[in-house]
Amino acid sequence: PDIALLKTIIQLKHLMNGEVLQAAVKIAKQVADDIKQKLDMTIKRSLTGRLDKNTSSVTKCSANLDFKKTIRRNLKNYDKASNQLILKDIYFSGRVKKHNKKRIIIAIDESGSMLGSVIYSAVMAQIISELPFAEVKLIIFDTSIVDLSDHADDPAQTIMSVQLGGGTDIAKALTYCESLIITPRDTCVIVVTDLYEGGSEAQLMNVSKNIITSGAHLSFLTALDENADPAYDKATGQKLADMGSFVGGLTPDKLGDYIGKIFA
């Protein structure tokens, strides 16, 4: 995927109109589709807990018995004399977890330094929104907030909605995220940001504490891309980590693992 080209489009789209803008939207969609195709199955498998039936499960119980595979693999052991199938090998498939509805709230910082993470976050929101047990709330923010939850399944729309410039008010965005929490223990709040707060740091800490205390899961992703090599405000990050939130950069597949473990 040509991430560099898409970053340039985002930076210059305010100068585009007509056919040029339409072409830019097509490129955004193509890049998003390419990323999704690359990540889709890996992320969904991490999140659903569904194991490939070609892989034997370590949990061997009747609920996990792969009946068809067991019969198929033991046909060679059929005893004609006794008219019985001798089961010499028993096969088990992975467990399929049952889920309550989970709410994933993703807040994306529009800062220019976060462009790569914005692109991957938009695609991740689409992938997660396609899961039957997940409900995605998606916002982008600087000093104002835009709720794109109705477009969580359209990463190109999210990407082309980004408005670079202006300040950053993470506390304000997180306060809005808090208002979207209904069942805390079934909620994960993910803020994709470099943590350079232009608003009130005290409010940021207070709201973070409230979310964690409620039982919801709070994460600050300082990078979400293939490199996961973030530049961020480490002092603020340390304070948030000390109170119990996750702070750090993740690759998309690692984010899938992380969310999967949270709701395991």
Where are these regions (language model features)?
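Acidic/polar low-complexity segments with low predicted structural confidence
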Residues: 1-101, 249, 255, 263
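Active-site oxyanion-binding pockets that recognize sulfate/phosphate
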Residues: 14, 108-111
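Acidic, glycine-rich A-domain
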Residues: 42-43, 69, 92-105, 112-264
